[in-house]
Amino acid sequence: MSSIKETAARFFEVCEAGLGWSGCRQHCHPDATFSAQAHALAGVETLEAYTEWMKGTFEPLPGGTYELKAFAVDEDRHNVTAYGVFSATHTGPGGPVPPTGRSIEADYVYVMEFDGDRIRHMTKIWNDTFTNEQLGWV
């Protein structure tokens, strides 16, 4: 395993477990940036903010899990791509409406760009509108 592959795998695991920045920071540059073309993530511009946002999703979606479908390293471009499916049911407090009891299976992709052996930037590709519809949030 390459160093960036190991780092990306560890980051993915702790981020998707909802451990927030305290669990993720060791894998990232302190000022790592974040981007996504998703309304739910508007204004989230740092990886620290994103990992805390992910942590917060476990309040309305307790027991959320993921299935890693693909994981690839591009050594030439110094990035790692992970494709997963996040599954959860809205049973907890939080979210824009009271618990709906509805479930999601949301496809998403992370593209983690490295500077040295740490993540410098991450892009999330995700259809938040579809996810919010599945949950009954829109």
Q: Locations of the language-model features?
A:
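C-terminal and inter-domain tail/linker signature
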Residues: 1-138
